[in-house]
Amino acid sequence: MISLRGSAALSPFRIEKILAALKGSAPRITHLYAEFWHFAWSDQPLSEAQQEVLKQILTYGPRMSEEAPAGELFLVIPRPGTISPWSSRATDIARHCGIEAIQRLERGIAFYAATADGSPLTDAEKAALRPLIHDRMTEAVFASLTDAQKLYHTAEPAPLSTVDILSGGKAALEAANAEMGLALSPDEVDYLIENFQRMGRNPTDVELMMFAQANSEHCRHKIFNADWVIDGVAQAQSLFGMIRNTHKLNPGKTVVAYADNASIVEGGKTKRFYPLADGQYGFVEEDMHFLMKVETHNHPTAISPFAGAATGAGGEIRDEGATGSGSKPKAGLTGFSVSNLHIPGFKQPWEHNNGKPDRIASALQIMVDGPLGGAAYNNEFGRPNIAGYFRTLEIESAGEIRGYHKPIMLAGGVGNISARHAKKNPIPPGAALIQLGGPAMLIGLGGGAASSMDTGANTENLDFDSVQRGNPELERRAQEVIDRCWQLGDKNPILSIHDVGAGGISNAFPELVNDAGVGARFQLRDVHNEEPGMSPREIWSNEAQERYVMAVRKEDLPLFAEICERERCPFAVVGEATEEKRLVVSDRHFGNTPVDMDLSVLLGKPPKMTRDVQHVARELPAFDHSRIDLKEAAQRVLRLPGVADKTFLITIGDRSVTGMIARDQMVGPWQVPVADVAVTLDGFETYRGEAFAIGEKAPLALIDAPASGRMAIGEAITNIAASLIEDIADLKLSANWMAPAGHPGEDAALFDTVKAVGMELCPQLGISIPVGKDSMSMKTVWEERNEKKAVTAPISLVVTAFAPTADARKTLTPQLRTDLGDTRLLLIDLGAGRNRLGGSALAQVYGSVGNVAPDVEDADSLKHFFNAVQKLNREGRLLAYHDRSDGGLFATVVEMAFAGRTGLELDIASLGEDAVAVLYNEELGAVLQVRAADLDAITAELETTLRGKVHVIGAPASHGDIVIRQGTKLVFAESRVALHRAWSETTYQMQKLRDNPVCAQQEYDRLLDERDAGLHAKLTFDINENIAAPYIASGARPKMAILREQGVNGQVEMAAAFDRAGFNAFDVHMSDIISGRVSLKDFAGFVACGGFSYGDVLGAGEGWAKSILFNPRARDEFTAFFNRTDSFALGVCNGCQMMSNLHSIIPGAGHWPHFVRNRSEQFEARVAMVEVLDSPSLFFNGMAGSRMPIAVAHGEGYAEFADAAAQQRAQDARLVTLRYVDNSGLPTEVYPFNPNGSPQGITGLTTADGRFSIMMPHPERVFRTVQHSWHPDGWGEDGPWIRMFRNARKFIG
């Protein structure tokens, strides 16, 4: 083992946070220092030259002050027996840099803790420090650097074992059931005993684990398929049968329902843009459908929030890629329901400490780490996350604590699939059965069974085993392979594909072949495996992530292998399909057969469950709101996380990657997160796309579970109504059902809710639910001081509505317009004046639930509402729109005011006499902004179908206050700024806790600046002029290399921008250059694209750069290219970071900075204002002096120059091309106007001759106007950033 000391690992503010956390438990620890250590293992000694290269590879990141270690050592390394994603990526980089002997690189952090007087730490002090410096699920703490050797332990393979039921009978299997955490029901134990006794042999542990996973509640949805007896009466339908009823009645435009990894909905002819067989990008017109899927990953997120949420997102992404015979994930959504946060120093009056078991994370920890995990996975994979929800609930109801100690972690999204690939093909006997993606690793074992149990019912070690770890960069590589396959059209080598999820390949391979009506033979030792010490059971059933299984014809294997080799994606042929419907797994190492059984035994019909349950009546007190003060109510409600500003959850997630996003969460010139709907685009030459929106009203279930289901659907519809949809029948719903099955009364309430949705409301609305998921163990049980405790979730239906949208430009937002003359606000009150407060945010912040819930009494009114909004939008008569939901009418109107930075004058007299109920009820409805001149006509039109439900409630005001009257009586007045600060305080507190507190404070204080003009555009060129037109007309299209490395994800939108500007864009992978397949001499220019090359290990872009600098062929290629006189290049984001590290071989780039971690120490996805500076850059010719918004998405964008002199020389030589400015146009280092803190706002540079330029923001994601989150009225099809690409075409001539 080679040990190499690295740089300081933690910034001062991170160290301070740890020391502050120790003040209560270990105040004597007054000093802490952390530094990286790297450990390398090789199969032969490294030469001196190789050792020098290794040292340079492992020198990365920002400059931070280092110190001599002092104090007691705590070495934090990955848990022995695991391989971290960092390790696999860093090892790849070393090998690509020519150090082939490297077997593994790993990284640890050495913490040195000291007391003021230098005395040794006590055991209690050590115990207090350890949980603050490591994640016990993924890391371990040791006391010596030599302990890192434990990471590289090669064990002999563990043997197969059997369970002796032939002599031990049922008792033997029951003991194994408990010991292995199989979660088998008594009926399933009997079923297995019967079948194996019939076979005359004992089952292997491999077969039992495989059976348990394949037949777990998680995988087989036993409760949803069960027979039901309620209050002694047998029910005619199962829960799933009632859901299927919606599709049976309204199957229109649904291509696949309930039969694949995602549901497929009919699309239309679309021009898709991708690289063709020769590598050149082009448009291909084909029939393209969209697919929809929403999953949950609740149990793993409770145990290890970052990893659990990350792999939840990753698993759902795989579902979208493994549909049909290969598909493309496109855009995502994320949601969280947790118990109360208890933010330190920000305790809220409705929060009470009900305790929690030690084994699970607190709600606060889940909301600090979980969203980061989900966002990090989406970001690195390259899927924009553009919708979500966040709910907290922990309250006493009917003598019980109801809440989300077991959280909901929702992950979903949309994708696209070619019509020709929508169905899985037959698998002929002899076809190769392939595992694509990462290796088997001992993680996630038994996750399917574990997630089917109540939290706390499993043993702690098994809970640890059932959590997975994610490597999104590897999943990206696997998706690139899938993309190359489906892009071959009819020559797609993939016959059928499944993702590997719960149960690992022991579930995925049987599903793959069983669905095709064939069997299979496998060789266990051909499974790609990096932990040779695993037992056969562990190899077959582990839930290592980033894996797919697929069938490929033998004759297509060479083509498939060629694609995988180019994408550097591991794959293994593990078996072949057989005519006999039998599953056989052989093990050549031990010479035995761990699995040999008919598929009908594994996946046949184990005994069907019967649920015999009772209704339970609960006495619920009314919510007494008679003494509530409206000002206090506003302050409380606006701080409730379900209502409050969710910026801290949104800006950590990339929302612009792909260039296919028309509407994300952030709205208007001030980027306020209040959008009702997410909208994507179908391509780069269309305005058609997909819309999706979430509905969720779980607290109502504590009063009336069926009402909560109806209201969730209603909310999804009132949200998605903000997009332009041709017909309500085009809506397709995903239903995610969470329930504490077995809790008194809850099963019957679940049945009633499914019936209300599946048999009544959806049929009345004419819409269907073709996809969904259930999680039936939403209860946490534990013991505390010998007292049994429990926190039980309410029945929770999360509905996601999806639909094709006819024109993404017609999406309405809540931003009130104050620049379009005299306007009015209309409320459409679908509650028809009932003003019920049960289950509301208001009730919750006063510690109550109430006993009367809002409901959907009239499906026709909901349909009329939807149709009316669509008609008015189509006709251009609506200026703003926002649905009424959490926080009631009050939250609706103040959010609209926040987005428009305006005051309001409202009169609520027509809505009822009870001002509290009027303002805070959460009945369905929406507020519309219309022109005053249109008011009478629109009101009359709405009244024809919504009689008595339409109210004029006021108008935007020229002052800065929110003023609400009831006729002549003033009932509420407060400044918009004060309310906005209250609404944003929760997000500020979370950012302050999680990120750099200085940045959090700057963003929060931005709200105080009433002169902030917001995003704007000041252009010094004609946006409508196409300066490349003459050159395009000549017919000449220069060749442009669209360069990517493994983990890059922004290449397609970059190619589209250069294609539009008159280039022929070619897909060039670094593997093409290193292998000699492609040479840069054949291209006029190249662009290095954005993403996460090598997952940003060894510094963002640095691994990519070093694989060029230390690979002789690559270095020669790039050096020759840069030294040509006619070449040019652009580096954006990750490509910018990479090229900045090549400055030694780029003429004129000597003063370029190094790009390091953002000052916030967080990934920042923002719309930022930039100014183009006067420079020699060919890309910015004629643009100097322009100011305009641009997409930003990076974690390491701080421009770190060698020294102040180098920065000054770069500026003096006019090498700085772009800088961040604030909303008044001044260069800035203030967050978030400058999202990374770069000195003087510097974010783009060029060389002395202007041919090579680098920039951190993303012009390729916003070259069309429709791609902008906000833009001025009047821009046409092209946005201003297309000028950059056209300048490059003009440069060539």
Curated annotation (Swiss-Prot):
It holds the Pfam family AIRS_C. Residues 1040-1293 form the Glutamine amidotransferase type-1 domain. InterPro entries: Class_I_gatase-like, FGAR-AT_N, FGAR-AT_PurM_N-like, PurL_large, PurL_linker, PurM-like_C_dom, PurM-like_C_sf, PurM-like_N_sf. Keywords: ATP-binding, Cytoplasm, Glutamine amidotransferase, Ligase, Magnesium, Metal-binding, Nucleotide-binding, Purine biosynthesis. It catalyses: N(2)-formyl-N(1)-(5-phospho-beta-D-ribosyl)glycinamide + L-glutamine + ATP + H2O = 2-formamido-N(1)-(5-O-phospho-beta-D-ribosyl)acetamidine + L-glutamate + ADP + phosphate + H(+). CDD domains: GATase1_FGAR_AT, PurL_repeat1, PurL_repeat2. It is an enzyme of class 6 (ligase). SUPFAM superfamilies: Class I glutamine amidotransferase-like (SSF52317), FGAM synthase PurL, linker domain (SSF109736), PurM C-terminal domain-like (SSF56042), PurM N-terminal domain-like (SSF55326), PurS-like (SSF82697). It comes from the Bacteria. GO terms for cellular component: cytoplasm. It is found in: Cytoplasm. Mg(2+) binds at D676, E715, N719, D883. The keyword Lipid metabolism does not apply. GO terms for molecular function: ATP binding; metal ion binding; phosphoribosylformylglycinamidine synthase activity. ATP binds at G308, A309, A310, T311, G312, A313, G314, G315, E316, I317, R318, D319, A675, S885. The keyword ATP-binding applies. GO terms for biological process: 'de novo' IMP biosynthetic process. In the N-terminal section; belongs to the FGAMS family. Monomer. Phosphoribosylformylglycinamidine synthase involved in the purines biosynthetic pathway. Catalyzes the ATP-dependent conversion of formylglycinamide ribonucleotide (FGAR) and glutamine to yield formylglycinamidine ribonucleotide (FGAM) and glutamate. This is Phosphoribosylformylglycinamidine synthase. The gene is purL.
